[in-house]
Amino acid sequence: METVITATIIGASILLAFAALGTAIGFAILGGKFLESSARQPELASSLQTKMFIVAGLLDAIAMIAVGISLLFIFANPFIDLLK
């Protein structure tokens, strides 16, 4: 039973790490493309900024969903019931 709990915690940690990595890479690409497009067409900067903030919110949702799934696995582990 301890191995299942340990494996679940390690899996949740890996899930959080990849979610944070994906969010960081997504924000880096998003910011770079926003600056590039604003420099190319400055008159569209306000429109692009609104769209950038919407996409940034969706990128943050990835990390929040990963936190929720990890908390589910850590505190309400569904795999322990399979051992009984």
Curated annotation (Swiss-Prot):
GO CC: one term? plasma membrane
Give the location in the cell: Cell inner membrane
Known Gene3D superfamilies for this protein?
A: F1F0 ATP synthase subunit C (1.20.20.10)
Instruction: Cite the entry's keywords alphabetically.
Output: ATP synthesis, Cell inner membrane, Cell membrane, CF(0), Hydrogen ion transport, Ion transport, Lipid-binding, Membrane, Transmembrane, Transmembrane helix, Transport
Give the primary localization class. membrane
**Residues of the site described as Reversibly protonated during proton transport:** D60
GO MF annotations, alphabetized: lipid binding; proton-transporting ATP synthase activity, rotational mechanism
Q: Does Cell inner membrane appear among the keywords?
A: yes
Q: Name one Pfam family in it.
A: ATP-synt_C
Lineage: superkingdom: Bacteria
Give the way it sits in the membrane.
Multi-pass membrane protein
The answer to keyword Chaperone applying to this record is no
Span-the-membrane segments of this chain are: 9-29, 54-74
Per UniProt, subunit arrangement is: F-type ATPases have 2 components, F(1) - the catalytic core - and F(0) - the membrane proton channel. F(1) has five subunits: alpha(3), beta(3), gamma(1), delta(1), epsilon(1). F(0) has three main subunits: a(1), b(2) and c(10-14). The alpha and beta chains form an alternating ring which encloses part of the gamma chain. F(1) is attached to F(0) by a central stalk formed by the gamma and epsilon chains, while a peripheral stalk is formed by the delta and b chains.
What protein am I looking at? ATP synthase subunit c
Its taxonomic path starts at: Bacteria, Pseudomonadati, Pseudomonadota, Gammaproteobacteria, Pasteurellales
